[in-house]
Design a protein with these regions (language model features):
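Short amphipathic alpha-helix that is part of the acyltransferase structural core
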Residues: 1-42, 50-52, 59-60
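Pocket-edge structural micro-motifs
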Residues: 6-8, 67, 98
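Secondary-structure boundary elements
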Residues: 12, 26, 56-57, 121-130
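Short acidic (Asp/Glu) patches
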Residues: 33-40, 44-47, 73-85
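Short, well-ordered loop/turn elements at secondary-structure boundaries
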Residues: 46-48, 128-129
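Short beta-strand micro-motifs in enzyme catalytic cores
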Residues: 47-51, 92
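Short, His- and charge-rich active-site/binding loops that engage polyanionic ligands
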Residues: 52-86
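Acyl-donor binding region in acyl/amide transferases
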Residues: 73-149
Length: 149
C-alpha cells in the first residue's frame, strides 16, 4: 500500500532528495554529484516542505512545496514579471517543484494525482496560499496539459 504524506524525518527528506536526483539524472535534467542528492537553496528554508509517497520504507514519489519568501520561488528565475505581478497584488503563493516518481510504479497516474492533490490541499488549507504554481520542463508540458487541463 502506498501512503502520501508530509516528510517528517531527515531520513525521509534524504530519500526524497535522492529520488529527485536519480530521476533528474536519468532524464538529463541534472548532472552527477558525489552526494547523489538534489538539494536547492529553497530546501534549506523553513518555508519549504517535502512530501513523499512511500511503499513500506521506500520513497516512490516526492514533491516539494516552496512558499514565497526570502528567496522567492524557483519559477521566478524564468517568470520574473509574472511572479512580480502576483506579488504586487498581495497574493499569497507558492510553487510545487521537484515533482518526481520512481518509474514502473503500478497506477502511476493515480499516484501522481494523489500526491499532487495532497500538496495542493496542504498549500490551500494549512498554509492558506491563494495560488500554487507548477513550472514544467518543456518536454513535460503536454503531459501536464493532458492530465491537469
Amino acid at each position: 500500500m502506498i501512503t502520501c504524506r508530509l516528510a517528517s524525518t531527515i531520513e525521509e527528506w534524504v530519500k526524497a532528495l535522492r529520488l529527485v536526483y536519480q530521476v533528474y539524472q536519468q532524464t538529463g535534467l541534472w548532472g552527477p554529484n558525489r552526494y547523489q542528492l538534489r538539494v536547492t537553496p529553497y530546501h534549506l528554508l523553513p518555508s519549504t516542505d517535502v512530501f513523499v509517497a512511500t511503499e513500506h520504507a521506500t520513497v516512490v514519489a516526492s514533491a516539494t512545496l516552496v512558499r514565497d519568501g526570502l528567496l522567492g520561488i524557483p519559477a521566478e528565475a524564468t517568470y520574473q514579471r509574472e511572479i512580480r505581478d502576483h506579488r504586487s497584488k498581495k497574493r499569497v503563493f507558492g510553487e510545487i517543484t521537484c515533482l518526481v516518481m520512481k518509474g514502473g510504479e503500478q497506477g502511476e497516474l493515480n499516484l501522481f494525482l494523489s500526491l499532487l492533490r495532497l500538496v495542493v490541499q496542504y498549500a490551500r488549507y494549512t498554509e492558506h496560499l491563494d495560488e500554487v504554481f507548477l513550472a514544467a520542463h518543456p518536454r513535460h508540458i503536454s503531459f501536464y496539459q493532458r492530465v491537469l487541463g
